[in-house]
A protein has these predicted regions:
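Helix N-terminus capping/helix-initiation residues
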Residues: 31-34, 111
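Periplasmic/extracellular, small/polar-rich flexible segments of pilin-like filament-forming proteins
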Residues: 53-150
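N-terminal single-pass transmembrane signal-anchor helix
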Residues: 1-29
Length: 150
């Protein structure tokens, strides 16, 4: 007598593997999204922290001049890429310096996973602290604008 699996036993194994795959794959996708949200949230907080530390130590932001325009030199102040993206969506981007001392113009994206990122408690408070003027959002650093050089 030959020993081996019957056709019915093999079909049952295939069905069980299919059920396990149907349950595991959506959970794996959700875990990947959660990991992406955590990574982006950490990058945004690190970017803001690095910019604040640079502004506190130097009293100004690093800038670079290209022709007649001046922009903020993000790579000189942090290793976090600008804009901060969740997959392909921009969640946070530093646009440039504002006319107000110690403030940067920023954009906050809410597409895709970005909407979930801004619901996190730490980043919700950051989003709430942004000031809006003329439909532009600004992130304020430093104190009340005291200039010790005068």
């Amino acid at each position: 007598m030959k020993k081996g699996f019957t056709m019915i036993e093999l079909i049952f194994v295939i069905v069980i593997l299919g059920i396990l795959a149907a349950v595991a794959i959506p959970r794996l996708a959700a875990t990947r999204d959660d990991a992406e949200i955590a990574k982006v949230a950490t990058n945004i907080q690190t970017l803001i922290s690095d910019l604040g530390a640079y502004y506190t130590s130097q009293g100004k932001f690093a800038t670079k001049t290209s022709g007649e325009s001046t922009s903020v030199d993000i790579p000189a102040m942090t290793n976090v890429s600008n804009p901060v993206k969740a997959k392909t969506d921009n969640c946070f981007e530093v646009i440039g310096p504002s006319t107000t001392s110690g403030a940067l113009e920023v954009t906050v994206g809410t597409a895709g996973l970005c909407s979930k990122i801004w619901e996190l408690p730490g980043l919700k408070s950051v989003n709430d602290s942004l000031t809006t003027t003329d439909n532009k959002k600004y992130l304020k650093f430093g104190g009340i604008g005291i200039d010790w050089n005068k």
